[in-house]
Amino acid sequence: MEMYNFMINEGKGPVSEKFIALNIHDFDAASTFIAGLSYKRNQDKNNILCVFEDKGGTCSTKHAVLRKLALENGQDSVKLMLGIFKMDSKYAPSIKKTLDQYRLAYIPEAHNYLKIGNHYYDFTKPGSGYNDFKSNLLSETEIEHDQITLEKITFHREFLRNWLDNERIGYNLEEIWSVREKCIEDLQKPTKEEPETNFSPVCFQNSPEVRDEYK
């Protein structure tokens, strides 16, 4: 699949200017640069330039800045997506004990990525890919670059609330959110199946900053 691309033009906005200052002049190079940045908590996720200032970011901030770059250059076809997928023990063996403890087959987790036309792209880390979680995708919605904080959490929690009701899961929202946090803790403990050097396509795995994504 050929990578979607466009030129970054001067005078279009703050994100474009940041990339040009780094001698990055097209979307392909910009997305490669973003994927290569460290996965880390951002000090202010409401600041669209935070990935440059912090020299890293999460799945939210990394894809938000690419969406903003596209908008600045008249490329509205680059959409920012929020997906909810089944996080199960097949995907992440390290959470099996917690899922078994609470008698759950999986727990719905959130992730950000891009959709361009009929193709999906994940620039969370080098080698990240949509196909790694596509088969487990439960829901997705388009959001804007300035909706990755409160709106993302609200969407995720509302999805969980409906899931609990529809699937007749015997937990309330706060209890299932606590189980989710335990799963996240499990993901930060390297196992033989998931060595510490393995890069997951989903933003949270093996990332010590992950719990701050929802703080």
Regions found by a protein language model. Give the residues of each.
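Proline- and acidic/polar-enriched loop/turn elements at helix boundaries
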Residues: 46, 82-83
